[in-house]
């Protein structure tokens, strides 16, 4: 006769009541120290005010074509996506600010290379973009259920809190984030909990920040969009890198205009999946035969 299963234990936050802040000039060692302490860190001033304004203007025609809520018939997914939330993808096609200042941002790529590196070496060729979309939360949107993003990749879940990160997400605020308008909430320190531990929404804190700032977090931390109790929309671009042996959320090679891709840097092309992938120790993934897929696409002059 087997013994009864013990109930899950409630996790305990690390006691921080506000997320720590860095800037694009902060040394990576300090960025990662703060990120590893809380599971999330605010990067101040990723975009300048004029860039935020232009980004909003470039995204508005796209947002005008999207309905609020989800197109799925699956009720739990509808609630997860948010009935008053606009999630629009394909940002590379419609925004020069996204292409020039986020997709090809040296600081964001430096963070990704370190996050997905191994053996003390940066993983310059170890990641690509999982998704890039808006999460624009309208008035009256209830709080999202708290969750961990690594649920997309079950084998990473099996590795537990000591396993590597499957993804790194940058939430770039296009409006101010406040507690009242639905700032993304994080339970600080929850990325270190055993994954069978439970939590309570009251343990979460809001990632309050200004437009142009960015929230960085990984796949292991417990988080979720807050409730928008105001009369104004809370806007952001959610930009996620994942290890490039994993399937991305967004199928960029089927979405992004090849004529736009031709004008991008090799790094940006690789990040979007228009070049083959070379994680450390691999002879190549995402190939055409055993050849670089970019050559087949006419992106190389060789």
UniProtKB/Swiss-Prot annotation:
Q: Which UniProt keywords apply?
A: Dioxygenase, Iron, Metal-binding, Oxidoreductase
What cofactor does its activity depend on? Answer: Fe cation
InterPro entries reported for this sequence = Phytyl_CoA_dOase-like (IPR008775)
Q: In which pathway does it act?
A: Mycotoxin biosynthesis
| Chain intervals for the UniProt region annotation (Disordered) | 1-22
TM spans, by residue? none
Q: Which domain of life is it from?
A: Eukaryota
EC number(s) per UniProt?
A: 1.14.11.-
Chain segments annotated as coiled-coil in the UniProt record: none
An example molecular function term from Gene Ontology annotations: dioxygenase activity
Q: Does the keyword Transport apply?
A: no
Hydrolase among keywords: no
Q: What class of enzyme is it?
A: oxidoreductase
In which residues is Fe cation bound? Answer: 147, 149, 223
Quaternary context: Homodimer.
Something else known: Gene clusters encoding host-selective toxins (HSTs) are localized on conditionally dispensable chromosomes (CDCs), also called supernumerary chromosomes, where they are present in multiple copies. The CDCs are not essential for saprophytic growth but controls host-selective pathogenicity.
Main function = Dioxygenase; part of the gene cluster that mediates the biosynthesis of the host-selective toxins (HSTs) AAL-toxins, sphinganine-analog mycotoxins responsible for Alternaria stem canker on tomato by the tomato pathotype. ALT1 also selectively transfers methyl groups at the first and the third cycle of chain elongation for AAL toxin.
Into which family does the record put it?
A: Belongs to the PhyH family.
Protein name, per record:
Dioxygenase ALT11
What is the originating organism of this protein? Alternaria alternata (Alternaria rot fungus)
């Amino acid at each position: 006769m087997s013994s009864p299963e013990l109930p899950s234990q409630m996790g305990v936050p690390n006691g921080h009541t506000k997320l720590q802040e860095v800037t694009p000039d902060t040394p990576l060692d300090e960025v990662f120290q703060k990120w590893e302490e809380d599971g999330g860190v605010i990067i101040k001033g990723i975009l300048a005010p004029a860039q935020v304004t232009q980004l909003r203007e470039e995204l508005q025609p796209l947002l005008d074509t999207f309905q609020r809520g989800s197109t799925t018939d699956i009720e739990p997914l509808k609630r997860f996506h948010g009935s008053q939330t606009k999630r629009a993808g394909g940002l590379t096609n419609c925004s020069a600010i996204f292409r020039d200042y986020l997709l090809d941002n040296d600081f964001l790529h430096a963070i990704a290379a370190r996050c997905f590196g191994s053996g003390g070496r940066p993983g310059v060729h170890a990641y690509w973009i999982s998704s890039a979309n808006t999460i624009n939360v309208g008035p009256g949107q209830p709080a999202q259920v708290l969750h961990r993003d690594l649920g997309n990749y079950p084998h990473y879940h099996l590795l537990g809190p000591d396993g590597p990160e499957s993804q790194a997400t940058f939430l770039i605020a296009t409006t101010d984030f406040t507690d009242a308008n639905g700032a993304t909430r994080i339970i600080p320190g929850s990325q270190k909990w055993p994954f069978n531990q439970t939590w309570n929404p009251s343990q979460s804190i809001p990632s309050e920040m200004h437009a142009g700032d960015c929230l960085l977090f990984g796949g292991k931390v417990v988080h979720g969009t807050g409730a928008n109790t105001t009369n104004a929309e809370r806007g952001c671009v959610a930009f996620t890198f994942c290890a490039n042996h994993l399937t991305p959320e967004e199928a960029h090679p089927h979405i992004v205009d090849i004529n736009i891709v031709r004008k991008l840097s090799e790094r940006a092309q690789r990040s979007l999946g228009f070049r083959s992938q070379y994680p450390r120790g691999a002879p190549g993934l995402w190939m055409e035969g055993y050849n670089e897929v970019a050559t087949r696409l006419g992106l190389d002059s060789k």
